[in-house]
């Protein structure tokens, strides 16, 4: 088994590399050197993930629990750990400093390790040891779960050198901070096992798991990769739409359009296997238990033995009109007394795509062919229906549909290439969206500041970033401090307190996890931010709990808006 120290050494090497090609070479060499059992684990670890995106397992360790584990393992007080976070600005460097200053208190350490019937201080830990402890942590719940998680974390830190602890601490909150994303890992797998990058990408699209793809590439190359299949209850990334400046531009780009309403709802991916139904949010979280009405509608009205469907769940009032987006999020968050919430906020499901049907993968088929099969297997009713679609290249017809969608209280229209296949996780011109001119941006919160005066205990100013899909980095684009109520600031402070990965004075660095919908007056060129742009008069519109950080606006989109402003 490979020692975790070897993984930490590779991470340290990568952290000092700026070239994506050099990073790819280092990751490739590491993937070639490890066992098949370790391969999927390391593939995820090097991206800062513990489990694949589709997995129901969630590590769920917040910074407060991590601080406590470092305190217990090092013998430093909790305040000393918090002070180290402020002085170093990084939880990894905090772990290095804390374990470097480790106080000699053998009695305390031995007591904390008795649960494991082994002396952690006397053994080195392997990569698989770390993964198995993380797996145990993810499965603890209920009374006593925090102390059980704590004991596992203590074991790991007591088994680690201070250098190993740097990456162990970061991995615990799934933010490795070495700049390795999916693109680099895809290319590293390709190079390590001599499989074309396109085949690796194809396998990833079908499985949503680069770990599985890496194992297939190692064991059988292209032949084994070609055997990878989409599977029920393993959600794949959802295809994304690009904003079009006008309907005329969309027709120029695509010619004939498949026009659909863009509903003001929450996107879902539904997996049906007989009467077993699982529903996943656009962040690939399993929300089945919160949506029993959608489950029942699919059972009754989708006539297929097995299927993977996509659609929008829309909250409606007594007249069938759409309710506020926040009401939908209440449904998705609800875990207790769900039936009461079902009565208070009923949902309808508008289906628009099908990716899998009765054992056949459909995503390579055209949108029109997929839609034919979707229509054939769904019985439309009040609770579930296939979204209406019109094929046209007439600007006036599209404008009429657009106006009808807006008058119905929805966001606008989707303009799709009727001949396009389905591309998981890809944003491009095959799917376009047209919304009103007052555009908003979905941006990731990467840092923040504690407030002043009566708001001193609240986080009140947030640093925003767009996404660069080429290297998986988040690029700062400005700050927002307006549009928040005191109640909202209190709620957000509670959320962000568990995402702190560094602190210096009033400034805090956050794990990129939360997406804000931001209104703005203008995008300007700026040398103050890493994106090269800044927002003029940004203000909060919504917290987009349904969106993942990687679904934030891309740097290309920011540049496009900037150029369009200039005419």
Curated annotation (Swiss-Prot):
Domain of life, per lineage: Archaea
Annotated keywords: ATP-binding, Cell cycle, Cell division, DNA damage, DNA recombination, DNA repair, DNA replication, Ligase, Magnesium, Metal-binding, Nucleotide-binding
Catalytic site positions: 262 (n6-amp-lysine intermediate)
Gene3D superfamilies, per database record: DNA ligase, ATP-dependent, N-terminal domain, DNA ligase/mRNA capping enzyme, Nucleic acid-binding proteins
Glycoprotein recorded as keyword: no
Binding residue positions for ATP: 260, 267, 282, 312, 352, 427, 433
Recorded GO MF terms: ATP binding; DNA binding; DNA ligase (ATP) activity; metal ion binding
EC number: 6.5.1.1
Chain segments annotated as coiled-coil in the UniProt record: none
Cofactor(s) this protein cannot do without: Mg(2+)
GO terms under biological process: cell division; DNA biosynthetic process; DNA recombination; DNA repair; lagging strand elongation
Reactions that this protein is recorded to catalyse: ATP + (deoxyribonucleotide)n-3'-hydroxyl + 5'-phospho-(deoxyribonucleotide)m = (deoxyribonucleotide)n+m + AMP + diphosphate
Family assignment from sequence similarity: Belongs to the ATP-dependent DNA ligase family.
Described function: DNA ligase that seals nicks in double-stranded DNA during DNA replication, DNA recombination and DNA repair.
PANTHER family in the record: DNA LIGASE (PTHR45674:SF7), DNA LIGASE 1/3 FAMILY MEMBER (PTHR45674)
Protein name, entry field: DNA ligase
Native source species: Methanococcoides burtonii (strain DSM 6242 / NBRC 107633 / OCM 468 / ACE-M)
Taxonomic lineage from the root: Archaea, Methanobacteriati, Methanobacteriota, Stenosarchaea group, Methanomicrobia
Designated gene of the protein: lig
């Amino acid at each position: 088994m490979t020692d975790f120290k070897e993984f930490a050494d590779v991470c340290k090497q990568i952290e000092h590399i700026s070239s994506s090609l050099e990073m790819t070479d280092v990751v490739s060499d590491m993937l070639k050197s490890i066992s098949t059992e370790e391969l999927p684990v390391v593939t995820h670890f090097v991206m800062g993930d513990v489990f694949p995106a589709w997995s129901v397992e969630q590590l769920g360790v917040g910074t407060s629990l991590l601080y406590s584990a470092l305190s217990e393992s090092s013998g430093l007080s909790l305040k000393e750990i918090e002070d180290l976070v402020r002085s170093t600005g990084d939880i990894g460097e905090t772990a290095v400093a804390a374990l470097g200053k480790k106080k000699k208190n053998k009695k305390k350490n031995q007591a904390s390790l008795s649960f494991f019937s082994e002396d952690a201080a006397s053994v080195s830990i392997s990569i698989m040891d770390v993964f198995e402890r993380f797996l145990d942590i993810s499965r603890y719940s209920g009374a006593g779960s925090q102390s059980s998680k704590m004991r596992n974390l203590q074991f790991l830190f007591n088994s680690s050198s201070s250098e190993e602890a740097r990456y162990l601490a970061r991995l615990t909150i799934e933010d490795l901070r070495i700049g390795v994303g999916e693109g680099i890992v895809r290319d590293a797998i390709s190079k390590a096992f001599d499989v074309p990058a396109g085949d690796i990408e194809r396998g990833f699209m079908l499985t949503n798991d680069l770990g599985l793809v890496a194992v297939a590439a190692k064991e059988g190359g292209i032949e084994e990769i070609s055997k990878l299949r989409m599977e029920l209850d393993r959600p794949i990334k959802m295809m994304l739409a690009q904003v079009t400046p006008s309907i005329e531009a969309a027709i120029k780009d695509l010619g004939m359009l498949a026009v659909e309403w863009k509903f003001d709802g929450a996107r879902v991916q539904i997996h049906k296997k007989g009467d077993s139904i699982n529903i996943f949010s656009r962040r690939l979280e399993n929300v089945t238990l919160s949506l029993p009405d959608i489950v029942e509608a699919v059972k009754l009205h989708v006539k297929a033995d097995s299927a993977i469907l996509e659609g929008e769940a829309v909250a409606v009032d007594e007249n069938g009109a759409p309710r506020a987006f926040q009401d939908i999020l209440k449904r998705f968050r609800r875990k207790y007394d769900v039936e009461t919430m079902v009565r208070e906020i009923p949902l309808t499901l508008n289906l628009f795509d099908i990716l899998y049907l009765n054992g056949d993968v459909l995503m390579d088929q055209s949108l029109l062919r997929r839609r034919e099969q979707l229509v054939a297997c769904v019985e439309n009713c009040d609770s579930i229906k296939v979204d209406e679609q019109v094929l046209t290249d007439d600007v006036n017809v599209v404008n009429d549909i657009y106006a009808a969608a807006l008058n119905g209280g929805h966001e606008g229209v989707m303009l799709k290439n009727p001949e396009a296949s389905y591309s998981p996780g890809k944003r491009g011109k095959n799917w376009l969206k047209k919304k009103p001119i007052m555009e908003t941006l979905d941006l990731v919160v990467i840092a923040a500041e504690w407030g002043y005066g009566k708001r001193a205990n609240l986080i009140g100013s947030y640093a925003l970033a767009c996404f660069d899909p080429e290297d998986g980095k988040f690029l700062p684009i400005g700050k927002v401090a307006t549009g928040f109520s005191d109640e909202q600031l209190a709620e957000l402070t509670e959320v962000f307190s568990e995402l702190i990965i560094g602190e210096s004075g009033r400034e805090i660095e956050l794990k990129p996890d939360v997406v804000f919908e931001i209104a703005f007056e203008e995008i300007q060129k700026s040398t103050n931010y890493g994106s090269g742009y800044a927002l003029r008069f940004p203000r909060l519109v919504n917290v987009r709990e349904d969106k993942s950080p990687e679904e934030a606006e891309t740097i290309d989109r920011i540049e496009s808006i900037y150029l369009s402003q200039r005419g």
